[in-house]
């Protein structure tokens, strides 16, 4: 099964954070993992703003973790961007809205602890 990881789900997985739910851990261990380029961008933005602490500069650290954990990077397509316009404004975070649109367009569940995702027609794993 292909799954799309929210920003925090990927960060918590690679740092073995206890906040990652047992169900999410099981799914991550048995699925084809994808992380959106949008989430990569969000993580870099958070690291630059001092809201995310990483052991190395964000770009090389995250690139290395993607590779060593066999996580594929999902680019943003035109269909993803166009789908955002169709989404109700339950959630106003632009990173999350695009991630939700990607999950819908690809037909993949999203691994996230964010309760707002459940308001959209996308399967949520947590």
Label every PLM stretch briefly.
Residues 1-36, 49-64, 106, 115, ...:
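Short, well-structured N-terminal submotif of metal-dependent ribonuclease cores
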Residues 22, 125-126:
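Short glycine/proline- and charge-enriched loop/turn segments
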Residues 41-42, 80:
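Short, basic/glycine-rich phosphate-binding loops at helix/coil junctions
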Residues 55-63, 67-116, 125:
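Active-site neighborhoods of divalent-metal-dependent phosphate/nucleic-acid chemistry enzymes
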């Amino acid at each position: 099964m292909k799954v799309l990881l929210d920003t925090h789900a990927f960060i918590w997985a690679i740092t073995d954070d206890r906040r990652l739910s047992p169900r999410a851990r099981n799914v991550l261990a048995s699925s084809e993992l994808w992380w959106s380029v949008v989430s990569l961008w969000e993580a870099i933005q958070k690291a630059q703003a001092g809201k995310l602490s990483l052991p190395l500069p964000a770009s090389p650290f995250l690139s290395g973790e993607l590779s060593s954990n066999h996580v594929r990077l999902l680019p943003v397509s035109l269909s993803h961007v166009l789908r955002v316009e169709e989404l109700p404004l339950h959630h106003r975070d632009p990173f999350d809205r695009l991630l939700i649109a990607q999950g819908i367009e690809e037909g993949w569940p999203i691994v996230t602890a964010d309760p707002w995702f459940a308001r959209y027609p996308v399967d949520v794993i947590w």
